[in-house]
């Protein structure tokens, strides 16, 4: 069932590659299946296409952590802090700061 949803999202992205809502949905479906490398790639494309409020940076950072890419995760958290503060989400920024402190 989840694979079918991923196939549908991929077809929709193929038809409309600049639709950030669809791309974010695909990334979330990939995360559910623990397909972290693919999810990270989709999140990076998503972030290059839109002014995210911070949530996607957090998802990307956590995904990169799971992949053992700590420096990239650190950068994603830092970008997430900037985005969260810019969009008036100090609680999210604080969560990312704590996650940064916990990175090895």
Label the model's feature ranges.
Residues 15, 49, 83-87:
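Structural marker of alpha-solenoid helical repeat scaffolds
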